[in-house]
Every structure is written in C-alpha cells, then in structure tokens.
Amino acid sequence: MSLIDRFIAEFDTALRSVVGGAHSRRPTPGSGEISHANLDVAQRKHAAGLMRVNHVGEVCAQALYQSQKMLARNPQIQVMLEHSGQEEMDHLAWCETRLQELGSHPSYLNPFWYAGSFAIGMLAGLAGDRWSLGFVAETEKQVENHLESHLETLPQEDLRSRAIVDQMRIDEIEHGQAALHAGGVVLPDPVQKVMQAMSKVMTTAAYRI
C-alpha cells in the first residue's frame, strides 16, 4: 500500500470514528434478542448512557491504535495493533447500532475525545514500542474493568446490550494480553493513576453528553 493509500485509509478510519458509519466484520452480539425487551424509560436511558460511554471508549481506542501503529518500530507490532484496531472497529459499530436502537446518540464530544486520544497515543508511541505496548495493556485493563461494572448495572432484560458488552470485554482482555506478550511493560503506578483519573472524566461526561 502506497503512502497516499495509507493516508486515505487512516483518514477514513478517523472519519468513521468521529462522524459515524463504522462497519463491523463480525455479526453484532445479541442480534437475535428483542431490541427493547421490557425496558422502561429509565432503563433505556441508563442503557443508552452506558453504551454511549462504551462508544466513546471505542472512538478513543481507534485514535490510540492509529497513532501508536504509525510510530511502532517493529512491523510485527504494527500488524498486532492493526488486528486489535480492526476488532475495536467492530466494537465501535456495535455500540453505534445499539445506541440507534435505544433511540439515543453518540457523544457530541467525540471530536474532542478522538483528538485527545490521538495525541496521547503519539506520546506513547514516541516513548518506544515497549512503553507503547504497556500503555495499550493498561488501557485495555481499565476498559475491561469499566465493562465489568457496566454488566453489573445494565438491566438484566437488556440482553442485546449485555451481549455486546460481554463480547467487548472478552476482546479487550485478549488485546491487553497480546500487548504484554509482544513486549509491553507494566506502567508505573503514578501513570496508571493519571490514566484512571482521565478515564473518570471521560466516562462521567460521555454518559450525559
């Protein structure tokens, strides 16, 4: 693929992440379940808020994987990041579809989330592959924790959302393990704490906006 073709492909990914229209290569989990099964207004609103948070997380994931893939020194790491990024695109499409089914919308702050995450990913990439992969692993670990907490509060009747979140959780675990196996280092505790604080701001805002 030429440099121009790569640029067009990456720009298309960025546009689909921010504006919408992501395509999934895998079927949407829970697609055989009833879309709004016995959800009252409050339950649907809560489910939509959580799925919006998850959608923002996938917007950020696209930015992180794109920027870190651009700066990866090792071609094998680039391939690994590309594979994980494609599965994250599935997640993005699933969340987007579920938000539409719930009569809601993605976060209005998606351009901000994408730009900020892209910049952070560039910084991680500049630090070198081992630190960049460590950042991926820690990010996926925190996302896994968020998804587990969502499974605890999503309405039991919302089988479609729950199926999506559970499959995302499984994928995130695999992505984090792949990053560590590829040579990622465990990030220092202060860095983990800063990442957790930033994540808290993002999830709180995305739930509402």
Swiss-Prot record:
Q: Which GO terms describe its molecular function?
A: 3-demethoxyubiquinol 3-hydroxylase activity; metal ion binding
- Leader sequence residues: none
Question: How is this protein positioned relative to the membrane?
Answer: Peripheral membrane protein
Cofactor(s) required for function per UniProt: Fe cation
The species this protein belongs to is: Polynucleobacter asymbioticus (strain DSM 18221 / CIP 109841 / QLW-P1DMWA-1) (Polynucleobacter necessarius subsp. asymbioticus)
Q: What is its EC number?
A: 1.14.99.60
Q: Please explain the role this protein plays, according to its UniProt record.
A: Catalyzes the hydroxylation of 2-nonaprenyl-3-methyl-6-methoxy-1,4-benzoquinol during ubiquinone biosynthesis.
Cellular location(s): Cell membrane
**Gene Ontology CC entries for this record:** plasma membrane
In which pathway is this protein known to take part? Cofactor biosynthesis; ubiquinone biosynthesis
Known catalytic reactions:
a 5-methoxy-2-methyl-3-(all-trans-polyprenyl)benzene-1,4-diol + AH2 + O2 = a 3-demethylubiquinol + A + H2O
Quote the record's cofactor note. Binds 2 iron ions per subunit.
Gene name for this UniProt entry? coq7
Keywords of this entry: Cell membrane, Iron, Membrane, Metal-binding, Monooxygenase, Oxidoreductase, Ubiquinone biosynthesis
Family membership noted in the UniProt record: Belongs to the COQ7 family.
Residues engaged in binding Fe cation 2? E88, E140, E172, H175
- Name its GO BP terms in alphabetical order: ubiquinone biosynthetic process
Q: Fetch the SUPFAM superfamilies from UniProt.
A: Ferritin-like
Q: What is this protein called?
A: 3-demethoxyubiquinol 3-hydroxylase
CDD domains on file: DMQH
